[in-house]
Each structure stands twice: as structure tokens, then as C-alpha cells.
Amino acid sequence: MRAIIETVFDIFYLATVLTVGIRMIHGSKSGSQFKLFGLMAVVLGAGDSFHLVPRALALCTTGLENYAVPLGLGKWITSITMTVFYVLLYYVWRKRYQVEGQKNLTIAVYALSAVRVLLCMMPQNQWLTNKTSLTWGILRNVPFALLGLLIIVLFYRSAKDHSDKAFRWMWLTIVLSFGFYIPVVLWADVNPL
């Protein structure tokens, strides 16, 4: 029963996020923040599909333990697309608040992202096995968490400084996103569901 419910939910989620993202891209002006949000949705959905589709197949067939390689590859790809997602969110911030310059800030965003991707590429992560490394799970997420913290601070300060009611809680949505993500990193192998 769990396999069916989770699979139906995943199909609904992927179809929704990809459809909304594509519609936002096609319905927005070139270079607009809404086009960036659409691109973010497509990156998120496409990245998530690399681990949700193999997970659904595993749950509906022979089990997760028999799908170590496709599940690991999917988590690996998702880790990188999540990084791209936050780089795009940085550009939403720049566009929304008409930020010019800030070269050092942009360098920091790209440096943290590059370190994250580099750490994700290391074989010590053991992505393609049933037992990934908790230590490397933590290490590769340190630059990701710092990138997230940077984006949180940028949106918090800018929304406050510009009295931006529409984005006043954006920082909190990012905090919640990381709040839900951290337990997955720390305890996914303890209780893989």
C-alpha cells in the first residue's frame, strides 16, 4: 500500500512541478524573475525525477536494496541540481531587488557551489552503494548549508529593507527547506523507509 501511495504522490509532484515550471518559462518575459522561478521549478523537478522514478520502480518491484545504483545515481544528480536551484534563487534575488555589482557576493555563491559540486563528485560518497558515507554526507552539505544561509540572509535583509510584503517570508521558506532536508541527510540510511 505504501508503495502505491508514495508512487502516486511522486507522479503528482513531478507532473505538477514540471508543468508549472514549463508554463512559467513560456508565459514570462525573457530575463524576468518569473522565468527564473520557472527554470528553478524545472531544475527541481528534473533533478528530483532522477531519484524519485528509480525509488518508485524499486518500491513497486523488488525493493530498494536491489536498486542501489539507480537510486544512488539519482541522489547524486539531485544533490547537484539542488545546488543549481539555489544559484538560480540568488539570481532571483538580484533581479527582484535590482542588485548591481556585488562581485564578491557572486564569487562567494559560485565558490560555495563549486566546492559543493566537487565534494559531491568524490568517490568517498559511495553514491552507488547501499551504504553511503554519513561523514561525506555531512561534508558535502557544509558548503550547501553556507550557500543556503547566505541566500536566507540576502532575502531577509532585502525584503525588510524594501518593505517587500510578497517576499517577506521567503527567508523562512528557505529555512524550512533546509530544516526538512537536514534530517534526510543525517538519518536516511538509519531509516530508509
Language-model regions, residue ranges each:
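Extracellular/periplasmic helix-loop-helix junctions in multi-pass membrane proteins
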Residues: 130, 182-193
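Hydrophobic alpha-helical membrane segments
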Residues: 44-47, 115, 143-153, 165-186
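Membrane-interfacial loop-to-transmembrane alpha-helix junctions, especially the N-terminal start
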Residues: 28-43, 100-109, 162-173
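Internal transmembrane alpha-helix with an interfacial aromatic "cap," most often the third helix
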Residues: 21-27, 50-67, 72-107, 118-124, ...
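A loop-to-helix transmembrane entry motif
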Residues: 6, 105-109, 130-148, 170, ...
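Membrane-proximal first intracellular loop
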Residues: 1-7, 19-45
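Hydrophobic transmembrane alpha-helical segments in integral membrane proteins
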Residues: 1-18, 137-141
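Membrane-helix boundary elements
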Residues: 111-137
